[in-house]
């Protein structure tokens, strides 16, 4: 017998469609979907890593490759992982600097989720002998003081892990 949790899925459009092709029109927050967080009272970290990220240099058109890692403490919403994957695919033919990409991913996730905290790490492969790593993060404005302290302590603890992304 199959059992079911209280997860809300009725508004998800991408998951289960079999759609795997790169979206038209480039990256956009409209490609992302979210579902309700069943545990908004508890600060916990969600980490999503996309190790096959590719985009194009806006000057040369040469490919840039790397890993994009998103870490966040959800408030009311969580990002749906397949929509996140398709969002990442949308960068494949998009020309932009690595610094802009990392900050745009942060802003798009903040617009969609309004998380308590979010950090995006762009760990780009060396090109021309230079390795670029970009880190962008933001805390939610206006959290009650007690919640803010708990969130910041959770972030501090998460960041002190030796390698929180290793299985």
Swiss-Prot record:
Pathway: tRNA modification; tRNA-queuosine biosynthesis. It is found in: Cytoplasm. Its EC number is 1.7.1.13. One of its GO terms (cellular component) is cytoplasm. The active site is at residues 57, 64. Residues 1-24 are annotated as: Disordered. GO terms for molecular function: preQ1 synthase activity. It catalyses: 7-aminomethyl-7-carbaguanine + 2 NADP(+) = 7-cyano-7-deazaguanine + 2 NADPH + 3 H(+). Keywords: Cytoplasm, NADP, Oxidoreductase, Queuosine biosynthesis. HAMAP family: QueF_type1. Belongs to the GTP cyclohydrolase I family. QueF type 1 subfamily. Catalyzes the NADPH-dependent reduction of 7-cyano-7-deazaguanine (preQ0) to 7-aminomethyl-7-deazaguanine (preQ1). NCBIfam families: QueF-II. This is NADPH-dependent 7-cyano-7-deazaguanine reductase. It comes from Desulfovibrio desulfuricans (strain ATCC 27774 / DSM 6949 / MB). The lineage of its organism: Bacteria, Pseudomonadati, Thermodesulfobacteriota, Desulfovibrionia, Desulfovibrionales.
């Amino acid at each position: 017998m199959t059992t079911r949790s209280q997860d809300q899925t009725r508004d998800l459009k991408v998951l289960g469609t079999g759609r795997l092709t790169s979206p038209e029109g480039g990256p956009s927050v409209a490609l992302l979907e979210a579902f309700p967080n069943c545990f908004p009272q508890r600060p916990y970290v969600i980490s999503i890593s996309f190790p096959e990220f590719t985009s194009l240099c806006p000057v040369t058109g040469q490919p840039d490759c790397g890993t994009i890692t998103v870490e966040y403490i959800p408030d009311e919403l969580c990002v749906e992982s397949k929509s996140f994957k398709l969002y990442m695919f949308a960068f494949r033919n998009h020309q932009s600097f690595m610094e802009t990409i990392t900050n745009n991913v942060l802003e798009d996730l903040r617009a969609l989720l309004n998380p308590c905290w979010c950090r995006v790490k762009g760990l780009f492969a060396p090109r021309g002998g230079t390795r670029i790593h970009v880190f962008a993060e933001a805390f939610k404005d206006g959290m009650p003081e007690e919640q803010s302290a708990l969130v910041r302590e959770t972030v501090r603890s998460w960041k002190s892990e030796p390698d929180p992304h290793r299985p």
